[in-house]
């Protein structure tokens, strides 16, 4: 995971993995739902690295947009980039990109290409609650500090 101060992101993470057999469908390339799982894995890693893992269980998805741009194949190395773009009082918005690199069976291969990008919005719903609530102050401070943005007074 890497924080990116000065890039406009409040906080960010970059995760690398491979397309596994379970990620593919009958057409021989990744199943669309795999993109969502890779994004959520990167989100969990970002919060774990910031010491905020408990947050993940209280942040249901309220909006998800995915643009599928290119297929990814079994064994292919991929990189997921996640950026926290907006931290609201009760929700937060992420942008993401999933990049595919060189397929193992293609020697000399092509340069990485974007396979998917999109937007993910989560809301703060504490355990036992049924409606959104404000994010805890310690979470806001930690996220803002990760991106080099000072907390609002």
Regions inferred by a protein language model and the residue ranges of each:
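HotDog/MaoC-like acyl-thioester-processing domains
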Residues: 2-15, 68-77, 85-153
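Catalytic strand-loop segment that frames the active site of acyl-thioester-processing enzymes
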Residues: 1-49
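Short alpha-helix capping/helix-loop boundary micro-motifs
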Residues: 63-67
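A broad, structural micro-motif
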Residues: 30, 59-61, 115
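Short, basic/aromatic beta-hairpin or loop at an interaction surface
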Residues: 50-59
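Residues that form generic nucleotide/phosphate-binding pockets
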Residues: 38, 50, 142-146
């Amino acid at each position: 995971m890497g924080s990116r101060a000065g890039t406009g992101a409040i906080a960010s993470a970059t995760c690398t993995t491979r397309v596994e057999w379970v990620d593919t469908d009958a057409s021989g390339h990744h199943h669309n739902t795999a993109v969502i799982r890779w994004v959520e894995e990167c989100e969990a890693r970002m919060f774990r690295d910031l010491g905020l893992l408990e947050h993940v269980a209280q942040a249901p998805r309220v909006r998800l947009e995915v643009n599928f741009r290119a297929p990814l194949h079994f064994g292919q190395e991929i990189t997921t980039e996640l950026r926290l773009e907006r931290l609201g009082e009760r929700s937060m918005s992420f942008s993401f990109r999933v990049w595919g690199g060189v397929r193992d069976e293609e020697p000399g291969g092509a340069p990485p290409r974007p396979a998917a990008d999109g937007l993910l919005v989560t809301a703060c719903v504490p355990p036992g609650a049924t409606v959104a609530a404000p994010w805890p102050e310690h979470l806001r401070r930690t996220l803002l500090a990760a991106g080099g943005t000072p907390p609002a007074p």
